[in-house]
Amino acid sequence: MNNDNIDRVLIAGAGPTGMVAARFLAGAGIPVTVVEASNELQKDLRASTFHPPTLEMIDQFGAAQHCIDAGLTCPLWQFRDRKQGAVATFDLGLLADITPYPYRVQCEQWRLNQYLREQLKEFPHAEIHYGVSSVSVTQDADKVALTVADDKDEQVLEGRYLIGSDGAGSAVRKSLGIEFEGMTIPEKYLTLSTPFDFQQAMPDLADVAYLSDPEEWVVLLRTKSVWRVLFPTHNQSDEEITDSALIESRLQSVIPRDEPYEVCLLYTSDAADE
């Protein structure tokens, strides 16, 4: 890793926050080094919605159009009752006079990250290192020193500033003694993807719908190729949550059908991960 430029900005974490920050800095001619604990950019089912203000921001380097092309534009979103149907439908198209993006874009955030990585390759003063975890940080009046570790040893990187975007369990935040007050809701979620078209069974269903129910709420979210379904879980282990028979039963409770549902991807997450 290049450690000979004290004026560089260090970024811990190559999620969308870290990658967008890196792109802005590199575009402004500022040297930047990103370190990411994973061996590759994450490619999972995390957040997949880009709202108008975010699209306006990332449009500065062409990323908004990339997300639009790779995703699905959704001007409508809904609150529904699982038994009674639509309760309220909101139309972002009403914002057309104040934003060039009067809609949500449903596009997996990893697609944005990959696009930004390709852009960062065009800047010789920008670098990304994978399999490198942030351990601790110190600072003085002139610089910041970030201790990082890979599978072999530790190294100290120095820079003018450090951006800590290394997640809910941030080593940067903990190292600086910055409190993270509040609580984590003790809830785990099941998120899955299916090619089944829920709008065929519910013609008035918006592309994004939050279904309320006293027993089990559900989120239905359409992407360009599949529907994502988010369920709460009930004090179960991951093995129980991901049991194929239970998943089939839960999907059948949303829309009963004769054929079994095809599930192409699923994962569980805690509230702190969302």
Question: Where are the predicted features?
Answer:
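Conserved FAD-binding catalytic core of PHBH/FMO-like flavoproteins
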Residues: 118, 143, 161, 165-266
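Beta1/beta-strand and adjacent pyrophosphate-binding region of the FAD-binding site
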Residues: 4-15
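Glycine-rich FAD pyrophosphate-binding loop
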Residues: 26-45
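Conserved N-terminal glycine-rich FAD pyrophosphate-binding loop of Rossmann-like flavoproteins
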Residues: 40-56
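A conserved short coil-to-beta-strand element within the FAD-binding core of flavoproteins
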Residues: 130-143
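Core beta-strand elements of the Rossmann-like FAD/NAD(P) dinucleotide-binding domain
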Residues: 153-161
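Conserved small/polar residues in nucleotide/adenosyl-binding loops
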Residues: 267-274
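Active-site-adjacent segment of FAD-dependent monooxygenases/related oxidoreductases
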Residues: 51-115, 119
